[in-house]
Amino acid sequence: MQKTISHAFPLGDVTWSNQGRLSIPNAHLESWLLNTGSLTQRLQTRCNDFKVQLVSQRQELATPAEYIQLGVSKMSQQKENWQVREVILHGDNQPWVFARSIIPQALCEADFLELGDKPLGHLIFNDDRFKRQPFQLMCLQPDEAFLHEYGLPPLTEIWGRRSVFCYQQYAMMVAELFLPKAPAYRDSNFDR
């Protein structure tokens, strides 16, 4: 049975830093945060049962910080429509990654119309026209409710990454938060 997540991404105010500005605690976690390949495909190799849980997909405004990262001017923010898609990637019925994607409405109507609970990564990484920009990273200490939900001790750090993908004249952003049971936090000796 899949665990339901009651927290919204990104769990409060988050400061994103350009790659190289944060000290990542170990090489194993760094390999997950900075891997430019398909996260979906990598997660699928670490479990027997992989699922995408669609939390929501709706037309809404992105945050001001997301618009800045997407390179969208204030004038364009009012004119363009965006879809915000939030999913949880589960491995063997454990929530591993919470992902938030900001996708131009026009792209949803063309290429992503029937995405539903399918992984976005299957589209992005099977089309050479998608070009990934450099990562930004974040590290936070979640609130007490989050720690309690996962049975975690205080001072537990949660890591995430985000990057912009350029596709033709469009830019879309994917942010991924590695949840506590994600393989990114496991010692590499325990990886499949």
UniProtKB/Swiss-Prot annotation:
Catalysed reactions listed for this entry: chorismate = 4-hydroxybenzoate + pyruvate
Enzyme class label: lyase
GO biological-process terms attached to the record: pyruvate biosynthetic process; ubiquinone biosynthetic process
HAMAP family recorded: UbiC (MF_01632)
Subcellular localization, as worded in the UniProt entry: Cytoplasm
MF GO annotations: chorismate lyase activity
Alphabetic keyword roster: Cytoplasm, Lyase, Pyruvate, Ubiquinone biosynthesis
Family, as annotated: Belongs to the UbiC family.
Gene Ontology CC: one annotated term: cytosol
Pathway: Cofactor biosynthesis; ubiquinone biosynthesis
EC number: 4.1.3.40
Binding site for substrate: 85, 120, 176
Protein's UniProt name: Probable chorismate pyruvate-lyase
Gene name of the encoded protein: ubiC
Domain of life assignment: Bacteria
Organism, scientific name: Pseudoalteromonas atlantica (strain T6c / ATCC BAA-1087)
Pfam families in alphabetical order: Chor_lyase
Role: Removes the pyruvyl group from chorismate, with concomitant aromatization of the ring, to provide 4-hydroxybenzoate (4HB) for the ubiquinone pathway.
Disulfide-bond pairs as recorded: none
